Amino acid sequence: MIKSIWIAGGCFWGIQKYFDSIIGVNHTVVGYSQGNVINPSYEQVCTQTTNHTETVQIDYDDRFVSLISILEHLYQIIDPFSLNKQGDDVGSQYRSGIYYVDHDDEFIIKDFLLKKQNQTPKKIMIEVERLRNFNIAEEYHQKYLDKNPNSYCHVDLSLSKKEFR
């Protein structure tokens, strides 16, 4: 069955490129979520006044990749202990988050993060919320690293080869 989850972890360019290489991920689109402005521009989001975060919508086939696997991948490519910062990207629009629409996913996500939290004394800074809104980003941001392969990316794209069950 095709399901969707929305994730944030710094600049959305690298997150999208990474998840596009995961078997079972059918489609990704980058955008802005959880904010208080309808259809914000990138420039507005960068002012940190809209409360949006750069987010990737991931549509996946759960026969080939599980939500747990997607969460494991996210956890390995971000610094889960960092607030409003990933790599060189700093600001509330770069905060880490997992956003869901399916109530069953909420339990899976919270259980996953609780298990991770129990393995470390550091506080995990990934917000978990029901998706309130998602506005698709400008076209030039879509598949940005495919169009601009030498651009900055905070994500180690080679980690996508690791499999999680």
UniProtKB/Swiss-Prot annotation:
Recall the GO molecular function terms of this protein's record.
Answer: L-methionine-(S)-S-oxide reductase activity; peptide-methionine (S)-S-oxide reductase activity
Is Oxidoreductase among the key words of this record? yes
Q: Which InterPro entries match?
A: Met_Sox_Rdtase_MsrA_dom, Met_Sox_Rdtase_MsrA_sf, MsrA_MetSO_reductase
- GO CC terms of this entry: cytoplasm
Q: Which residues cross the membrane?
A: none
Among its keywords, does the record have Phosphoprotein?
A: no
What GO terms in the biological process aspect are recorded for it? cellular response to oxidative stress; protein modification process
Q: Which UniProt keywords apply?
A: Oxidoreductase
**Catalytic reaction equation(s):** L-methionyl-[protein] + [thioredoxin]-disulfide + H2O = L-methionyl-(S)-S-oxide-[protein] + [thioredoxin]-dithiol; [thioredoxin]-disulfide + L-methionine + H2O = L-methionine (S)-S-oxide + [thioredoxin]-dithiol
What is this enzyme's EC?
A: 1.8.4.11
What is the top EC class of this enzyme, as a single word?
oxidoreductase
Q: Which PANTHER family match?
A: MITOCHONDRIAL PEPTIDE METHIONINE SULFOXIDE REDUCTASE
The family classification in the record reads: Belongs to the MsrA Met sulfoxide reductase family.
HAMAP family, from UniProt?
MsrA (MF_01401)
What does this chain do? Has an important function as a repair enzyme for proteins that have been inactivated by oxidation. Catalyzes the reversible oxidation-reduction of methionine sulfoxide in proteins to methionine.
What is this protein identified as? Peptide methionine sulfoxide reductase MsrA
Species source reads Ureaplasma parvum serovar 3 (strain ATCC 700970)
